Amino acid sequence: MAQATDVLVVGGGLIGCGLAWRLRRKGSSVILVEASDINAGASGQNAGSLHFQLEHRFLEQDDASIRQAAPIVALSRLAVEDWRGLEAELHADLEVEMNGGLMVAETAEQITLLEKKQAREADFGLKTHLLDGDEARRIAPYLSGSILAAGHLPEEGHASPRAIAPALARAAVAEGADIMTHTRVVSVAKAAGGFRVGVQAPGGPLEVIQASCVVLAAGIGTGRLAEQFNLHLPLFAAPLTLTATERAAPFMPHLIQHVARRLSMKQTHSGNILIGGGWPSRFAQRADGGLNLQARPILDPDALIANLTIAAEVAPTVANLSVIRTWTGATTVTSDQLPLVGPVSRTPGVYVATGGSGFTLGPTFSRLLADLICGDQEAAQALAIVSPDRFGHLNSFMG
């Protein structure tokens, strides 16, 4: 006999666990299935940045792309408030620090890019402050003399990727959600009032879940899952690299980013400096030549050296610290770099939540999706910029 639920969530990362928790608080029944462990994917492998300013990856594109991406700032404004209240809501220490962020520039051309970014952010209500180099060093004396300007946002910061999804999962279970780990979706069929989804643990029996709606929030696995619902989604796995230094006495309270170079940097509660910013690693290859998305990506030493070099140029103190760990992981991006969150109109009852910014915007995405699933159309307006329907044309031949 099939288990019946209002919502089946596929994926045990920050968004999936947050959604299960929010839905249970609204009274919906929820089953969450995760192919591995809770927080095993990008939600637990990222650098924990709360980057509400427009990111470098948007700014390195042409002006049209920047204009297209700028409306995501409206979601960033909502995320500021969601992060401020999350620890209190969960009664958990998530190591949330919102001491401000600085996006630095080292040339006149980069300052122009900062000014352009600031104008786009202001259009959507995000008030960043443009500081000259001396002003930036007064609040961040660890910055190099090469820094000529910085965009300052007092609300930016960081949190612990290792703590948040597990805390959300515990809260969801406490509210009555059913979480099944090491369980994969193996079959999907439309049924009256929703979907019949077959799930299975290794060596276990096939279990059938009857769900009114299904949310695909499985990170790099979301595209393959969507195919089981007869959908194409323009999702691409991106292998990335992060590095941690030895512990140091507190000296870097801010999130540091660069307007024109790949860099994110912050000091954790334990004193380590986490260094990233979108530097690539490499996927292993399967025997047939395809990408092996199940294996941990392979470190690219050249990318690592370049990342650490930029970090030391921006904050010279970092050059005196030993690297103790470097790791790789994979996130998911879309063809236009914006996340993919919301309902899929051509297949009523299917929702998607993936495609980047899943840590910074994850609590907001899960809250808005829960509201939307429960009938709040204002949430649909807030999510319009990241709607999957912007790629609806890809499914015009899917029947």
Where are these predicted regions, by residue range?
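Helical element adjacent to the flavin cofactor pocket in flavoenzyme catalytic cores
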Residues: G151-S212
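N-terminal Rossmann-like FAD-binding beta1-loop-alpha1 element of flavoenzymes
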Residues: V7-L32
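Dinucleotide-binding Rossmann-like beta1-alpha1 core, especially the glycine-rich loop
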Residues: S49-E135
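Central helical "cap/lid" subdomain
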Residues: A40, E207-H254
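C-terminal catalytic lobe of FAD-dependent flavoproteins
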Residues: T309-G399
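Glycine-rich FAD pyrophosphate-binding loop
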Residues: R25-N46
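Helix-loop-beta segment of a Rossmann-like dinucleotide-binding subdomain
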Residues: A92-M103, K117, F124, T128-E175, ...
